Amino acid sequence: MHFETVIGLEVHVELKTESKMFSASPAHFGAEPNTNVNVVDLGYPGVLPVVNKTAVDWAMRAAMALNMDIRTETKFDRKNYFYPDNPKAYQISQFDEPIGENGYIDIEVNGETKRIGITRLHMEEDAGKLTHKDGYSLVDLNRQGTPLVEIVSEPDIRTPEEAYAYLEKLKAIIQYTGVSDVRMEEGSLRCDANISLRPVGQEKFGTKAELKNLNSFSFVKKGLEHEVKRQEEVLLNGGEILQETRRFDESTGKTILMRVKEGSDDYRYFPEPDLVPLYIDEAWKERVRASIPELPDVRKAKYVSEYGLPEYDAHVLTLTKEMSDFFEAMIALDADAKLSSNWLMGGVNEYLNKNQKELHETALTPENLSEMVKLLADGTISSKIAKKVFADTVETGKAPKVIMEEQGLVQISDPEQLKAFVTEALDNNPQSIEDFKNGKGKATGFLVGQIMKISKGQANPQLVNKILREELEKR
């Protein structure tokens, strides 16, 4: 029997507002534990929540960027549950009237485009954070009340690879809107996955399991891959899939049972009595719509049509707003588009991945990389020298021309000087001359290598090849 995988993702995104969703407490990451808290966050008797209008605007902006319909009337609800990181014993959320509905994003997997539906986007407040120690737990309520949006996909995802692509695209869109930093390491983007299997051709969904503790996109992919195998094995052996919550253990690469899954009835939702419904007229919607900046798909199309970049290059450059903004700054400085793209996708990305950094954490500037690309384009430096210059400028922030002067890295293009290098290489390697005359093509490559060694990598390789062939013909 063959099974079809059905996956839906629930993504929580913290909005980077100055204050919290329903109180005036600061909503900043990294403060000392329990310092960004007030009586509203703690649910003291007699205090009342007040809706943060900026958070509502930003929730609408995110929903619009995800091609969603904005409700004219929306309300808040109480989600009742007890947990140590929830001092009020309820969370203010949205149940049956979310602010955004019926959206979608397009993803690319294996060169094909697929549309993934988005059921809803709703606003809510975040809970606090528990840190578990040996025999006790610490509670930090700084995060309590931070504005969140939860984005729930349709069960349109069929593979772990599609789930990964969906998360990448969703993160990029939210990042471009400017409403969140979407940093998983800081908790401003979190993901739960619902996954089930059903026989190929069957319309009815199978029983789903929810996966938690997915702390990176790669863990989402690995957790789903394991869960597909686990559920398939259970079903093939005649077993039954239970509706349960499981967590991904990154050390074993397996999912582990946490608890039997609750349904929405367990939370006893009811309308929030301390907040009136929100009425969102067309004028409000248009003000928010006008605030949406250029999104990744628009930039991608521009990079292909205006700058002549391949689809793949345009896709990679627009995956993060930071990289895309950097590229645009280089173009504004008249750097060659393709060379700039090659360096950002190659040398820059390699450096960032190796050092686990983001662009803003380096000393690299668009001005310096543009200068280096121009020097490379006009033949002032070779690719080999460019790599040396880049290694220095990304660490120090020095201008490429300054680095070249300090290290004597200017490419040598003077014909007489190059001819002297060629002559020295030929005099030192008579056997290579014989090999060339006997039709051995590798001899030329060897001699070019010797010339580059003599010139300490500074010889212009194009001119070297030309002069070398001329001199070989004379011998």
UniProtKB/Swiss-Prot annotation:
* A GO molecular-function descriptor: glutaminyl-tRNA synthase (glutamine-hydrolyzing) activity
Q: Which UniProt keywords apply?
A: ATP-binding, Ligase, Nucleotide-binding, Protein biosynthesis
The keyword Metal-binding appears for this protein: no
Q: Which EC class, in a word?
A: ligase
Gene Ontology BP term (one): glutaminyl-tRNAGln biosynthesis via transamidation
Q: Which InterPro entries match?
A: Asn/Gln-tRNA_amidoTrfase_suB/E, Asn/Gln-tRNA_Trfase_suB/E_cat, Asn/Gln_amidotransferase, Asn/Gln_tRNA_amidoTrase-B-like, GatB, GatB_C_1, GatB_Yqey_C_2, Gln-tRNA_amidoTrfase_suB_CS
A Pfam family hit: GatB_Yqey
SMART domains assigned: GatB_Yqey
Please give the catalytic activity noted in the UniProt record. L-glutamyl-tRNA(Gln) + L-glutamine + ATP + H2O = L-glutaminyl-tRNA(Gln) + L-glutamate + ADP + phosphate + H(+); L-aspartyl-tRNA(Asn) + L-glutamine + ATP + H2O = L-asparaginyl-tRNA(Asn) + L-glutamate + ADP + phosphate + 2 H(+)
Instruction: Give the matching Gene3D superfamilies.
Output: 1.10.10.410, GatB domain, N-terminal subdomain
Look up the EC number in the record and give it: 6.3.5.-
Q: What does this protein do?
A: Allows the formation of correctly charged Asn-tRNA(Asn) or Gln-tRNA(Gln) through the transamidation of misacylated Asp-tRNA(Asn) or Glu-tRNA(Gln) in organisms which lack either or both of asparaginyl-tRNA or glutaminyl-tRNA synthetases. The reaction takes place in the presence of glutamine and ATP through an activated phospho-Asp-tRNA(Asn) or phospho-Glu-tRNA(Gln).
Record's subunit section: Heterotrimer of A, B and C subunits.
Which HAMAP family does the protein's record reference?
A: GatB (MF_00121)
PANTHER family attached to this UniProt entry:
GLUTAMYL-TRNA GLN AMIDOTRANSFERASE SUBUNIT B MITOCHONDRIAL AND PROKARYOTIC PET112-RELATED, GLUTAMYL-TRNA(GLN) AMIDOTRANSFERASE SUBUNIT B, MITOCHONDRIAL
Similarity comment text for this entry: Belongs to the GatB/GatE family. GatB subfamily.
Protein's name according to its UniProt entry: Aspartyl/glutamyl-tRNA(Asn/Gln) amidotransferase subunit B
